[in-house]
Amino acid sequence: KLKILDIGGGAGETAKKLVILGHDVTIVVPSKILSERCVENTKGKAQVHKTQFEDYQPEKGQSFDVCLFSESFQYIPAKIALEKSKTLLNKNGTILIADCFRSEEKNNSHNRRPGGGHPLSEVRALIKELNLKIISEKEITKSVAPSLDIEQQFYNMMGFAFDRIRQGLLANHPIKTKIFHFFYNIFLN
């Protein structure tokens, strides 16, 4: 039975599977809606903290066997994520990161590249600086590349269409469009 800190645990789907396997799971997620979903999905068997990882305070003396970043590492400053995780681990603990990273490859296209992530070279330098070591690494770019190509094509097509609609609305209904943008930014940012 492992004590696992699921950082940025989404709706709790991964935590649900880990709880079923018998692990002790604590979830840190910044969204009220997602934190409620985590409680539902784990049937209350995981501790759920509605906070950003940067602000998370464990119970006194609490440490973890695993700090899990499942597609969440890219949203936290890398140095903070690694330093804080290191302090939360027990003696033989592991930081597990399953996420996207930026390569050094140049993007000569005018199109936005899909995906996010910290530059891999910077993360490697931080790992060395913090005296951490990589015990396993798996490159899956080739297996996800077809999906990324589809996402890029969709983004190019829909992005162009939405931009044209926005320009038309702004030209014909500038006040309504500005009011819409104001409320959109309040509720979705």
Q: How should these model regions be labeled?
A:
Residues L2-G10:
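Conserved class I S-adenosyl-L-methionine
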Residues N111-L188:
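Substrate-binding/catalytic lobe of Class I Rossmann-like enzymes that use SAM or dcSAM, i.e.
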Residues V66-A78:
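A short SAM/SAH-binding and catalytic strip from SAM-dependent methyltransferases
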Residues I80-K91:
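A short glycine-rich, Lys/Arg-flanked "PGG" loop and its adjoining helix->strand segment in the class I
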Residues G12-Y56:
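Class I SAM-dependent methyltransferase SAM/SAH-binding core
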Residues C100-E105, E139-K142:
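Short "lid" loop at the C-terminus of a central beta-strand within the Rossmann-like core
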Residues G93-C100:
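Conserved beta-strand signature within the Rossmann-like core of class I S-adenosyl-L-methionine
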Residues Y56-C67:
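A short acidic, Gly/Pro-enriched loop at the edge of an enzyme's catalytic core
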